[in-house]
Amino acid sequence: MFWIAFVASLGGLLFGFDTAVISGAEKDIQAAFGLTDAPFWHGFTMATALIGTIIGALICGKPAQKYGRLLSLKVIGVLYLISAVGSGMIDDWYAFMLFRFLGGLAVGASSVIGPMYIAEISPSSWRGRFVAFFQFNIVLGIVCAYVSNYFIKHYFVTNGVAADAFLQPWQWMIVSESVPALLFTVLLFSVPESPRWLISQKRDSEAEQVFVSVGEKDVNAEMDAIRESLHEELNIKKERLFQKKFMKPILIAFLIATLNQLSGINAILYYAPRLLEQSGVLTGAFSDSMLQSVIVGLTNLTFTMLGMSLIDKLGRRTLIAIGAIGMVVAQGLVARGFYLGEFGGYTLLICVCAYVASFAISLGATIWVVIAEVFPNSVRSGGQVFGSMTHWVWSATLTWIFPICVGTELVAGMSPSVMIFGFFSVIAALSLLFAWWLPETKGKSLEQIQKELIKE
């Protein structure tokens, strides 16, 4: 079972890797495709994968149900591989965006099918931990991308790669994703299909073999429970999501997804090296912006783990409130630094890490838990799709417009970064109000939550 969880969780690592690897290459991509004076198209190029993510998350459900979780994951692995090799080796702008879009389809689909597969194949006693491990690997993938970018840049700069080299450093950064993508795709041939899907296809004997292989203690009871669950799903009264009685869960999902993205996390993850270079104080042992990005990624990883361990102890509201205060202070200090035009020592790096840490233990750790909890069974799948789509749409939008905002002086004589991080700080303050308004769901059954939120 641990092997299956490891293989499936590589999908999460690829999810995070694909999201962050572009950060180290974005300045060179801008120059390579002549987008230096075209911030609109530079932002669009960066957001292409996220546009694919929206579509991938929307369309993956039916293929996963018709052809199985395992085959769907194999297709996702192939898409990751094609995207990494294609976008890294191509020198045509349109083809580059097409390959990045294919990678985005894989990210969106894996965000749905990966956790689904792990949840369906894991023994009940380990299910929560293995699903959480997938989420953890997303953040680990971000760190791996930053580390990969740093070593590739360091190697090529140290060895003085010629301008007419086969591939430029930024291309190697993107191609590097092909290694975990190939490993993921090949290893998927060593793991079984989801037993829940097999039972839904009347392939009970195969499902029984899978349960035996993963160490399920009471195979017959588990299979009976799945059959009963499938029967209940067929008989659940399906309802429209968008009606008055569901307005509070809808509003909660919309607000937490919106605050999650508009607090500025993608601006940090996608543009970290460029942002850190703007401080003008890259000196000393950690002078390389790529290395500073690694520090940011490790901070994200550490505090994501902390948030996951505290979410059922302190509760959703408390974590969001604590994180909101930290984000307000950190983003406010970044805005102040840009306003004064000075960042002493590693002030910007410290502030960015403080923001990322605050985000990771709050909005980062709680978003998917809250969205999964607030909707009743009759509309839960639709509600989760709505919350997920809200998240991805804002993610793509922010990534797209960030280069435009950075290059637009809204107030004469004032750095655009002052306005941008001032805005992020205001959004963080609104997160504090959201935490005050949000009903606490810690320690409550889904039925209790439904009674509190749904007004017939």
Describe the residue ranges of each PLM region.
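Alpha-helical transmembrane bundle of multi-pass membrane proteins
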Residues: M1-R203, F211, H231-E456
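Conserved alpha/beta-hydrolase catalytic His-Asp/Glu region
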Residues: K217-D218, G383
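Short, well-structured alpha-helical segments
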Residues: V219-E228
